[in-house]
């Protein structure tokens, strides 16, 4: 599991991105890069690192499911991911 401080930072960053999304869009359309530069760094969605929804793990993240490979495997074995079956050949 990731450190609680990292998970809290991730949620704070998500909130900042949501808060400044409309303003960023307007400033980009105008081409006002000076005002864009004055916005908080963490309001830029490019700086966001995808994290597992369950335990906050940043590595081996599967975008389609929103979880890491470890939690994906557990959820798939429990049958909690619709449409996922174990391969056998």
From Swiss-Prot:
<keyword id="KW-0687">Ribonucleoprotein</keyword>
<dbReference type="InterPro" id="IPR001209">
    <property type="entry name" value="Ribosomal_uS14"/>
</dbReference>
<keyword id="KW-0689">Ribosomal protein</keyword>
<dbReference type="GO" id="GO:0015935">
    <property type="term" value="C:small ribosomal subunit"/>
</dbReference>
<dbReference type="GO" id="GO:0005737">
    <property type="term" value="C:cytoplasm"/>
</dbReference>
<comment type="similarity">
    <text>Belongs to the universal ribosomal protein uS14 family.</text>
</comment>
<protein>
    <recommendedName>
        <fullName>Small ribosomal subunit protein uS14A</fullName>
    </recommendedName>
</protein>
<comment type="subunit">
    <text>Part of the 30S ribosomal subunit. Contacts proteins S3 and S10.</text>
</comment>
<dbReference type="InterPro" id="IPR023036">
    <property type="entry name" value="Ribosomal_uS14_bac/plastid"/>
</dbReference>
<dbReference type="GO" id="GO:0019843">
    <property type="term" value="F:rRNA binding"/>
</dbReference>
<dbReference type="GO" id="GO:0003735">
    <property type="term" value="F:structural constituent of ribosome"/>
</dbReference>
<comment type="function">
    <text>Binds 16S rRNA, required for the assembly of 30S particles and may also be responsible for determining the conformation of the 16S rRNA at the A site.</text>
</comment>
<dbReference type="GO" id="GO:0006412">
    <property type="term" value="P:translation"/>
</dbReference>
<dbReference type="Pfam" id="PF00253">
    <property type="entry name" value="Ribosomal_S14"/>
</dbReference>
<keyword id="KW-0699">rRNA-binding</keyword>
<dbReference type="InterPro" id="IPR043140">
    <property type="entry name" value="Ribosomal_uS14_sf"/>
</dbReference>
<keyword id="KW-0694">RNA-binding</keyword>
């Amino acid at each position: 599991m990731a450190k609680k401080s990292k998970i809290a930072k991730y949620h704070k960053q998500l909130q900042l991105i949501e808060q400044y999304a409309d303003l960023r869009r307007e400033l980009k359309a105008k081409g006002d890069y000076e005002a864009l530069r004055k916005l908080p760094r963490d309001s830029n969605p490019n700086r966001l690192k995808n994290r597992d929804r369950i335990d906050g793990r940043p590595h081996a993240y599967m975008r389609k499911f929103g979880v890491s490979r470890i939690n994906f495997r557990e959820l798939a074995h429990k049958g909690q991911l619709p449409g996922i079956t174990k391969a056998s050949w």
